[in-house]
Regions:
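Conserved active-site-adjacent core of cysteine acyl-enzyme catalytic domains
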Residues: 53-150
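Active-site-adjacent structural segments surrounding the nucleophilic cysteine of cysteine proteases
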Residues: 1-78
Length: 150
C-alpha cells in the first residue's frame, strides 16, 4: 500500500456557497463521494485538483450555469463521473486515459482478475458499490464511489 498517496475525504470539503444545492438538500460532505474519488485519483497522478474543483465540473455547465443533470437524490450518477472526467481532460488539459469496467454482482469474478492486474501495474480505479439492496457489501442505501489503488 502506498502510504504517500493523498487521501481526500468528502467530509472535509464544502459547497455551502452554492444556493441551488441548499434548495435540493444536496451537499458534498454527505453525497460527494464521486467528485472526491475523481480528485483522489487525479491529485495522486500529479494534478493540482481537489473535490470542490471536480464537483463544480459536474454541477455547472460549460457556460457556468448550475445544472443538476448529473445529480441524483443522494449523490452523482455514473454519467456524471464520465462527464466530469471528459471535461477535465478537455478543459484542464489533463492528459489521462481511462477504462470503464462493469462487474455484474451476480458474477463478480468475471472482471476481478482484470482489476487486480490493473492495480498491480500501478493504476487506480474508481469503483461504485451498492446500493445496499443490490450488494450486501455496501453500507449505503444509495451506493458509494471509492478509489482502489496499490
Amino acid at each position: 500500500m502506498n502510504l504517500k498517496r493523498v487521501r481526500y475525504k468528502q467530509r472535509d470539503f464544502s459547497l455551502d456557497d452554492i444556493d441551488e444545492l441548499k434548495q435540493i438538500n444536496w451537499n458534498l460532505e454527505k453525497y460527494g463521494c464521486g467528485p472526491t474519488s475523481i480528485a483522489n485519483v487525479l491529485v495522486n497522478l500529479g494534478f493540482k485538483i481537489n473535490p470542490i474543483d471536480t464537483a463544480k465540473k459536474i454541477l455547472y455547465d460549460r457556460n457556468g450555469n448550475f445544472d443538476n443533470t448529473y445529480l441524483r437524490n443522494k449523490g452523482i450518477n455514473s454519467n456524471g463521473i464520465i462527464y466530469c472526467l471528459e471535461r477535465l481532460i478537455k478543459e484542464n488539459k489533463i492528459n489521462i486515459s481511462y477504462k470503464i469496467v462493469k462487474i455484474d454482482f451476480s458474477r463478480p469474478n468475471d472482471k476481478k482478475e482484470k482489476i487486480i492486474s490493473l492495480m498491480k501495474n500501478g493504476n487506480m480505479a474508481i469503483i461504485h458499490i451498492g446500493p445496499s439492496e443490490e450488494s450486501p457489501l455496501s453500507f449505503s442505501k444509495n451506493g458509494h464511489y471509492l478509489v482502489i489503488s496499490d
